[in-house]
Amino acid sequence: MEVTDVRLRRVNTEGRMRAIASITLDGEFVVHDIRVIDGNNGLFVAMPSKRTPDGEFRDIAHPINSNHRGKIQDAVLAEYHRLGEVEVEFEEAGAS
């Protein structure tokens, strides 16, 4: 499995979310709503999730091993940093 495309939009929020990404896997499968989060130990990628009735978050889609998680994170963060080198217009979180 290879990440063949990354589409990313930065968001301007009060919280720790810095961007929302969509990735294409092997040119055939797209995963939307991947979040770039500024955590205590630096940036990381959070897979799309939804809140359960008991208030916890559960991933909707996620890699099943750390090797593939690393590939996704590396590709998304590389695009995030690449966009950081050019002037970007921020979107307000939740804007369509």
From Swiss-Prot:
UniProt-recorded name of the protein: Putative septation protein SpoVG
Protein family: Belongs to the SpoVG family.
Key words of the record: Cell cycle, Cell division, Septation, Sporulation
Function: Essential for sporulation. Interferes with or is a negative regulator of the pathway leading to asymmetric septation.
Family matches, as NCBIfam families: PRK13259.1
Entry's Gene Ontology BP terms: division septum assembly; sporulation resulting in formation of a cellular spore
PANTHER family cross-referenced by the UniProt entry: SEPTATION PROTEIN SPOVG-RELATED (PTHR38429:SF1)
Organism of provenance: Priestia megaterium (Bacillus megaterium)
